[in-house]
Amino acid sequence: MSLSLWQQCLARLQDELPATEFSMWIRPLQAELSDNTLALYAPNRFVLDWVRDKYLNNINGLLNDFCGTDAPLLRFEVGSKPLSQIISQTVTASVSAPSAPIVRVAAPSRPSWDNAAPQPELSYRSNVNPKHTFDNFVEGKSNQLARAAARQVADNPGGAYNPLFLYGGTGLGKTHLLHAVGNGIMARKANAKVVYMHSERFVQDMVKALQNNAIEEFKRYYRSVDALLIDDIQFFANKERSQEEFFHTFNALLEGNQQIILTSDRYPKEINGVEDRLKSRFGWGLTVAIEPPELETRVAILMKKADENNIRLPGEVAFFIAKRLRSNVRELEGALNRVIANANFTGRAITIDFVREALRDLLALQEKLVTIDNIQKTVAEYYKIKIADLLSKRRSRSVARPRQMAMALAKELTNHSLPEIGDAFGGRDHTTVLHACRKIEQLREESHDIKEDFSNLIRTLSS
């Protein structure tokens, strides 16, 4: 039985799983087949536990499909497979694989200042907030992959996920994860040189270096860190000199296996005003989206925040707030802080009626902004169709998919029941609305385009 069995499994898993999941969890695995046992080697315990928990049934099912009763036993281990296996497979692959053109890349010459006399030890401004850790980051379906990727980077900086690019709307937890990674790296190695900053700080530092004729010191500082964490990379847009310098810094860090993590409010290729060569490099490692939190995650965030403040928040109150404030975590926490402050000032118990009063203007604004009519108008404009098409009986995909999207958004962003949503879409049955919601949820898992459409529309409607 040859190791091509695992290659067959990989091919099927790549077809069946979303690309991000496959790249994050399956691709790093190494395999060794011996004595009717398939050993899968994971780079660390975190990956091993995740794969065994999430994909064990998938892998066993494929082994049974390919081998029937002769399927090998499956064993998981942390580490790498024996070197002899790697050499053997490399030789086999080189013989069996079709020849491909060999591209040789010249090693970049080291900057002249590298050959100068030893420089004084640099002092690093970490700027990592110790309050933001993985332990106090509330995980949900909307951010699960992003948290898992960040955790892996913290455990193995400079490894497979370099760079790590996190993107999503404002207030969804990207910055929290950046700090959590920084804290994780420094917890494992106390003297690690970890630098967190907003992209504008990089620009400001470069401008000062140019003004003070200290650009070589600037380069040495940024190219000698162990991990560079840059928030809101989209602010590099149209800053050509900054992009040029960051391009070379990026290359130097990657060459040195130093970790880079970037965040943005949009997918790399959608960042206008940034050079294509930079956008291409942003996607070299792993790119993960953070979605707006679903209801259960919003409730969990409120409960955890209340607990941190030693406040007892009744479950029904948390659900009341979470159902009405949906756009981002920052808005949720701000609303809860307001409720807590009002309760402390007045000495009153936190009830639904009290919350209605404390958040009166915020709730009124939210209800005014997000209506089914507004959703229909926004979706129609986004997909360049007519509102009448959404209400019609037409079933062509160019109309049906936007209609399903609008129904799913109505369920997510309003307090209307399924029958009420159905009535607003040409008198459709509530089961049609339920099917639309489930279909969009499924497509968000499978299609990057649908996921992006949903996030863009949520952002537009919640702004």
Curated annotation (Swiss-Prot):
It holds the Pfam family Bac_DnaA_C. GO terms for biological process: DNA replication initiation; regulation of DNA replication. GO terms for cellular component: cytoplasm; plasma membrane. Keywords: ATP-binding, Cytoplasm, DNA replication, DNA-binding, Lipid-binding, Nucleotide-binding. Residues 127-343 are annotated as: Domain III, AAA+ region. Residues 1-90 are annotated as: Domain I, interacts with DnaA modulators. Residues 91-126 are annotated as: Domain II. It comes from the Bacteria. Residues 344-463 are annotated as: Domain IV, binds dsDNA. ATP binds at G171, G173, K174, T175. GO terms for molecular function: ATP binding; ATP hydrolysis activity; DNA replication origin binding; lipid binding. CDD domains: AAA, Bac_DnaA_C. It is found in: Cytoplasm. Belongs to the DnaA family. Plays an essential role in the initiation and regulation of chromosomal replication. ATP-DnaA binds to the origin of replication (oriC) to initiate formation of the DNA replication initiation complex once per cell cycle. Binds the DnaA box (a 9 base pair repeat at the origin) and separates the double-stranded (ds)DNA. Forms a right-handed helical filament on oriC DNA; dsDNA binds to the exterior of the filament while single-stranded (ss)DNA is stabiized in the filament's interior. Domain I is involved in oligomerization and binding regulators, domain II is flexibile and of varying length in different bacteria, domain III forms the AAA+ region, while domain IV binds dsDNA. Oligomerizes as a right-handed, spiral filament on DNA at oriC. This is Chromosomal replication initiator protein DnaA.
